[in-house]
């Protein structure tokens, strides 16, 4: 077809007439298959009078060349390259230039710089041109081609950085500035150490360029700010010397109320990221005060007159969830404070933040008081330990006072803060149930009918607080259940019913068996919602599935008769309703049921795993974001007619995604993947051998999700892979076979290296913590098999050592920031604790002799955290890790006695009970396993522990002293326990808090029976007293009871008089019970 005829067809497509567009589309698809179509399109893109036609032709040419470039003859390719560059130089319309630049980028992706020297010449000539329009065209072309293949430009980085240093200074040309920043955005992740001096020169100019762009075009400025994000994230320290200037610029924009919300929010997102990656430098450069003084007024800003913040509105039509979801600068400023709490040591943040908080909370303005409560809420996330130890009573009092504030705005914030406190300040906050529960119940009852948004806030706080109460919920159970069941019985909105059903789950988690009297009524309501066909009740249906899963875990056995019905119901709903949230909750239900049914779930596993595989593989909800230039997607499928021909062609070229500027993902689909991973991991462990036929396919899909951009999905995938290893190990134990062993070894061979890689390279601390926890679980479950490949033990020790030395990617700081600072953010301390938990597991898996050389490397790293200047949390972690590792080392710990004992003796005198408790436990296990080197120090150890038992008031520490004394008595070289010590130890029983030490006490009873039973005549009354107290207690290990009864039977038979005299000291009912158990009545 002639270009004139093609032009007419394209014109038809631009008309506002659907029928003509349809016909023209059909014709065009036929025309474009002809060989003459490409020359006609090239003619139009270069010479059509109408810019819309030129742009349309450029887009269609690009889409054709995308898959057909290599089929063109060499002369045709050269001719096209020349024609496009000429057209680009002549073009005066921006939209056409952009399409031509993208067409050039498509060819460049195929050819590279070497095969297209004219492109490089044009870039060099145009970007240095004295004429502004030509320079702008050059920078536009540069930004597009660099984005299409950034690695190809790495050899030219210095030249490009010098160019950007010039162009970013041209504040009179906003176009130049924008394309320069786009180019820098793409280059930043590829910068090397050699590029740093030149790249740093750009930072002040970047700030000036942004200051120029913001007043001209806020939308373009938002896009250009990506350059700052990329430089902040860069592995080379480009921003650090200019951190103060960058922060000042960000704060100026953030506080400028004359600007639009979009640019202020975008700059607050930059600040959030800056805090995350440059927290140490912020403190070092004293930038925290100006940051806080800017953020607080933004958080406290009042909405326009007559309006409310989004989260304070009570509109059923546009239901906003309880989380802060408003798209206003206020909510993003709160997120910056949250990030500060997560990444700064609380000792540095709280003293600067608290005076501002106190002033806000005293203010007459409800929005100031609200700001104070919002900041308190997010502070509990990152500085939870600090608040628990030092500030909880006064801060909780402030929050409770907020629940009774005259302003609804403040009451809403107080409910949010209480919900966050309940989530982040466990277990301490639960001890305030007497103060909090009456307030919450009164608030719940005061919410007027129909005010579901206020009800949602009240339920959020109530759920989070109640969920962790355990037995403390019992006094409030009748009132709580009446409130919830009333909401379900009475006519109320679907949202109110959904909230009540959700709250029932939290109440069940706390109440456990105490919920049984209400179980029939709850099930009646849940059944009604689960079987409903009403569309408006679908959220209630989904919530009912989730609560059903919670009930299965909470009430246990009484749910077993309903398990099969629940399973069928879940599968049926997945079949009928296509909804990611419904699937997510159904999978959680299946996981809960697997705990009850075990291998009884086998008949449904094929259906369940088929659904889960679809969820793991699904790309639903992942939406390509197209570059603003590509308004012509009519012909996405214009090559369909040639599909068969292309399939025959071995040289089919890949689709070019250069139009796609990114992907947006709906969170519900990420949540679905995360919960699928969690559920399938749990099901694999609970169903064991029955899961084996599905293991391989599920494993492969979960493994792929380690590359997922969403951190919660990566975290869940790592956790599931660990559970698969544990499930395979369990299957090998119950059903040993070569294929099962091979499957376990193959899984470990992939999972363990992926864990090591994640610890070293993953940037998100939450993911690394989850990986370390999963690794610990795999080591405990699979033991020596985890370490099978040669060198694996050394590799794992190296990875854990890197965490303790703060050398992993998620702990990374600029070299300039590296300086000794005793304070650290609580999340950084938690990361070290997770590594610490893996060390004893590794010792136990490797065996003492193999692990001893590596322990010698860990020892100085742990001991240095017990010194005088260290925090309580650090000392507790270090001493706890040492003590647990001594157990893993066993007899091999003897060689370390001289280095360990001084540390344990000094920390046993600490003021903090947890540190003392860990140190005393450590002494006991060192006495038990340390052999002769430890026995030399027994008099010193007894000299410390014996008097300490009499004066110690903390239950857990007393229990650990009992455990340590028991170990000392059993390890005594004389094999004869000292009567005084034995009497004092037995007098201190029963254990109150650390019930695990009953195992040690049980071993002591066996030791006494075997080595010196006659010696226990003097302590017979104590033994009988202990026996009468623990006999009916289910928490005491059966072996411990059996050992004590054996000892008492010996006494009753061999020393009858002494035994009967001791029996007389007990209450009559207890004495009779004991005689019956011993068969003496």
Swiss-Prot record:
<keyword id="KW-0653">Protein transport</keyword>
<comment type="similarity">
    <text>Belongs to the importin beta family.</text>
</comment>
<dbReference type="GO" id="GO:0005634">
    <property type="term" value="C:nucleus"/>
</dbReference>
<dbReference type="InterPro" id="IPR021133">
    <property type="entry name" value="HEAT_type_2"/>
</dbReference>
<dbReference type="InterPro" id="IPR001494">
    <property type="entry name" value="Importin-beta_N"/>
</dbReference>
<dbReference type="GO" id="GO:0032991">
    <property type="term" value="C:protein-containing complex"/>
</dbReference>
<feature type="repeat" description="HEAT 5">
    <location>
        <begin position="895"/>
        <end position="932"/>
    </location>
</feature>
<dbReference type="GO" id="GO:0006606">
    <property type="term" value="P:protein import into nucleus"/>
</dbReference>
<dbReference type="Pfam" id="PF13513">
    <property type="entry name" value="HEAT_EZ"/>
</dbReference>
<dbReference type="InterPro" id="IPR040122">
    <property type="entry name" value="Importin_beta"/>
</dbReference>
<feature type="modified residue" description="N-acetylmethionine">
    <location>
        <position position="1"/>
    </location>
</feature>
<dbReference type="GO" id="GO:0005737">
    <property type="term" value="C:cytoplasm"/>
</dbReference>
<dbReference type="GO" id="GO:0031267">
    <property type="term" value="F:small GTPase binding"/>
</dbReference>
<dbReference type="GO" id="GO:0000785">
    <property type="term" value="C:chromatin"/>
</dbReference>
<keyword id="KW-0539">Nucleus</keyword>
<keyword id="KW-0813">Transport</keyword>
<dbReference type="GO" id="GO:0016020">
    <property type="term" value="C:membrane"/>
</dbReference>
<keyword id="KW-0007">Acetylation</keyword>
<dbReference type="InterPro" id="IPR011989">
    <property type="entry name" value="ARM-like"/>
</dbReference>
<dbReference type="InterPro" id="IPR034085">
    <property type="entry name" value="TOG"/>
</dbReference>
<feature type="repeat" description="HEAT 4">
    <location>
        <begin position="475"/>
        <end position="513"/>
    </location>
</feature>
<keyword id="KW-0677">Repeat</keyword>
<dbReference type="GO" id="GO:0061608">
    <property type="term" value="F:nuclear import signal receptor activity"/>
</dbReference>
<feature type="domain" description="Importin N-terminal">
    <location>
        <begin position="24"/>
        <end position="90"/>
    </location>
</feature>
<keyword id="KW-0963">Cytoplasm</keyword>
<dbReference type="InterPro" id="IPR016024">
    <property type="entry name" value="ARM-type_fold"/>
</dbReference>
<feature type="repeat" description="HEAT 3">
    <location>
        <begin position="431"/>
        <end position="471"/>
    </location>
</feature>
<feature type="repeat" description="HEAT 1">
    <location>
        <begin position="348"/>
        <end position="385"/>
    </location>
</feature>
<dbReference type="GO" id="GO:0008139">
    <property type="term" value="F:nuclear localization sequence binding"/>
</dbReference>
<dbReference type="Pfam" id="PF03810">
    <property type="entry name" value="IBN_N"/>
</dbReference>
<feature type="repeat" description="HEAT 2">
    <location>
        <begin position="390"/>
        <end position="427"/>
    </location>
</feature>
<feature type="repeat" description="HEAT 6">
    <location>
        <begin position="936"/>
        <end position="974"/>
    </location>
</feature>
<dbReference type="GO" id="GO:0034504">
    <property type="term" value="P:protein localization to nucleus"/>
</dbReference>
<protein>
    <recommendedName>
        <fullName>Importin-4</fullName>
    </recommendedName>
</protein>
<comment type="function">
    <text>Nuclear transport receptor that mediates nuclear import of proteins, such as histones, RPS3A, TNP2 and VDR. Serves as receptor for nuclear localization signals (NLS) in cargo substrates. Is thought to mediate docking of the importin/substrate complex to the nuclear pore complex (NPC) through binding to nucleoporin and the complex is subsequently translocated through the pore by an energy requiring, Ran-dependent mechanism.</text>
</comment>
<comment type="subunit">
    <text>Found in a cytosolic complex with ASF1 (ASF1A or ASF1B) and histones H3 and H4.</text>
</comment>
């Amino acid at each position: 077809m002639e270009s004139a005829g093609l032009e007419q067809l394209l014109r038809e497509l631009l008309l506002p007439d659907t029928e003509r567009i349809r016909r023209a589309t059909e014709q065009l698809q036929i025309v474009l298959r002809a060989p003459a179509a490409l020359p006609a399109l090239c003619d139009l893109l270069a010479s059509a009078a109408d810019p819309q036609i030129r742009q349309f032709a450029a887009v269609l040419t690009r889409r054709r060349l995308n898959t057909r470039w290599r089929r063109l003859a060499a002369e045709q390719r050269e001719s096209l390259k020349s024609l496009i560059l000429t057209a680009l130089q002549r073009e005066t319309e921006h939209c056409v230039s952009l399409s031509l630049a993208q067409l050039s980028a498509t060819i460049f992706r195929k050819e590279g710089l070497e095969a297209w020297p004219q492109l490089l010449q044009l870039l060099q000539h145009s970007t240095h041109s004295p004429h502004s329009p030509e320079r702008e065209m050059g920078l536009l072309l540069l930004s597009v081609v660099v984005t299409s293949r950034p690695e190809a430009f790495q050899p030219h980085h210095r030249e490009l950085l010098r160019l950007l240093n010039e162009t970013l200074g041209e504040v009179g040309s906003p176009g130049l500035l924008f394309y320069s920043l786009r180019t820098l955005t793409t280059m930043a992740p590829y910068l090397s150490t050699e590029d740093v001096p030149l790249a740093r020169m750009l930072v002040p100019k970047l700030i000036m360029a942004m200051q120029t762009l913001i007043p001209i075009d806020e939308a373009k400025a938002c896009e250009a700010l990506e350059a700052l994000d990329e430089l902040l994230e860069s592995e080379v320290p480009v921003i650090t010397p200019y951190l103060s200037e960058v922060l000042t610029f960000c704060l100026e924009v953030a506080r400028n109320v004359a600007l639009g919300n979009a640019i202020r929010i975008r700059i607050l997102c930059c600040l959030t990221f800056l805090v995350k990656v440059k927290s140490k430098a912020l403190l070092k450069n004293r930038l925290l005060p100006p940051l806080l003084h800017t953020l607080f007024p933004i958080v406290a800003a009042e909405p326009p007159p007559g309006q409310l913040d989004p989260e304070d509105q009570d509109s059923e039509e546009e239901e906003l969830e309880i989380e802060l979801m408003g798209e206003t600068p206020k909510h993003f400023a709160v997120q910056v404070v949250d990030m500060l709490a997560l990444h700064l040591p609380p000792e540095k943040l709280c003293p600067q933040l608290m005076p501002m908080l106190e002033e806000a909370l005293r203010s007459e303005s409800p929005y100031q008081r609200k700001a104070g409560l919002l900041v308190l809420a997010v502070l509990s996330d990152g500085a939870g330990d600090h608040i628990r130890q030092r500030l909880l009573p006064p801060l909780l009092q402030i929050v409770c006072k907020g629940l009774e504030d005259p302003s609804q705005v403040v009451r809403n914030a107080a409910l949010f803060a209480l919900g966050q406190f309940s989530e982040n300040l466990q277990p301490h906050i639960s001890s305030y149930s007497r103060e909090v529960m009456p307030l919450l119940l009164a608030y719940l009852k005061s919410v007027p009918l129909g005010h579901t948004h206020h009800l949602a806030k009240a339920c959020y706080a109530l759920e989070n607080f109640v969920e962790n109460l355990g037995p403390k919920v019992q006094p409030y159970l009748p009132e709580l259940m009446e409130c919830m069941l009333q909401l379900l019985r009475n006519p109320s909105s679907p949202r109110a019913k959904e909230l009540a059903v959700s709250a029932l789950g939290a109440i069940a988690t706390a109440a456990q068996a105490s919920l049984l009297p209400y179980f029939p009524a709850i099930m009646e309501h849940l059944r009604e919602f689960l079987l409903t066909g009403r569309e408006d009740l679908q959220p209630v249906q989904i919530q009912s599935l989730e609560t059903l899963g919670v009930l299965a875990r909470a009430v246990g056995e009484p749910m077993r008769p309903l398990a099969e019905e629940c399973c069928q119901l879940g599968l049926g709903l997945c079949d009928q309703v296509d909804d990611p949230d419904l699937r997510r909750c159904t999978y959680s239900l299946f996981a809960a049921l697997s705990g009850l049914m075990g291998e009884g779930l086998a008949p449904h596993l094929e259906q369940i795993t088929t659904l889960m595989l679809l969820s793991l593989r699904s790309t639903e909800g992942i939406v390509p974001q197209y570059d603003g230039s590509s308004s012509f997607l009519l012909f996405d499928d214009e090559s369909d007619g040639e599909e068969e021909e292309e399939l025959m062609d071995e040289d089919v070229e890949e689709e070019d995604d250069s139009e796609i500027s990114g992907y947006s993902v709906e969170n519900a689909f990420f949540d679905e993947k995360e919960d699928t991973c969690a559920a399938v991991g749990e099901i694999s462990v609970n169903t064991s051998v029955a899961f084996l036929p599905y293991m391989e396919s599920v494993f492969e899909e979960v493994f792929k999700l380690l590359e997922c951009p969403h951190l919660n999905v990566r975290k869940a995938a790592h956790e599931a892979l660990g559970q698969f290893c544990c499930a395979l190990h369990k299957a090998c134990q119950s059903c040993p076979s070569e294929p099962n062993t091979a499957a376990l070894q193959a899984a470990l061979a992939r999972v363990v290296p992926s864990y090591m890689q994640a610890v070293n390279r993953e940037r998100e601390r939450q993911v690394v913590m989850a990986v370390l926890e999963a690794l610990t679980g795999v080591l405990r479950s699979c033991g020596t098999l985890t370490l099978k490949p040669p060198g694996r033990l050394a590799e794992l020790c190296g990875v854990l050592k890197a965490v303790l030395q703060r050398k992993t990617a998620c702990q990374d700081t600029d070299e300039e920031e590296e300086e000794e600072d005793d304070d650290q953010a609580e999340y950084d301390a938690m990361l070290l604790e997770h590594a610490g938990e893996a060390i004893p597991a590794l010792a136990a898996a490797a065996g003492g002799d193999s692990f001893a050389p590596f322990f010698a490397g860990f020892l100085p790293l742990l001991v240095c955290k017990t010194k005088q200047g260290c925090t309580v949390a650090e000392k507790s972690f270090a001493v706890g890790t040492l003590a647990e590792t001594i157990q893993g080392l066993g007899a091999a710990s003897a060689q370390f006695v001289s280095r360990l004992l001084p540390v344990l003796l000094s920390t046993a005198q600490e003021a903090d009970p947890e540190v003392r408790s860990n140190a005393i436990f450590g002494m006991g296990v060192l006495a038990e396993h340390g052999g002769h080197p430890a026995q030399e120090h027994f008099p010193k150890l007894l000299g410390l522990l014996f008097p300490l038992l009499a004066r110690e008031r903390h239950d857990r520490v007393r229990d650990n002293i009992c455990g340590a004394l028991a170990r000392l008595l059993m390890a005594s070289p004389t094999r004869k326990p000292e009567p005084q010590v034995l009497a004092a130890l037995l007098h201190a029983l029963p254990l109150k808090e650390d019930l695990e030490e009953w195992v040690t006490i049980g071993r002591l009873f066996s030791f006494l029976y075997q080595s010196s039973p006659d010696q226990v005549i003097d302590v017979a009354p104590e033994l009988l007293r202990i026996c009468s107290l623990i006999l009916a207690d289910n928490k005491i290990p059966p072996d411990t009871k059996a050992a004590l009864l054996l000892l008492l039977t010996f006494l009753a038979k061999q020393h009858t008089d002494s035994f009967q005299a001791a029996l007389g000291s007990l209450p009559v009912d207890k004495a009779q019970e004991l005689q019956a158990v011993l068969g003496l009545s």
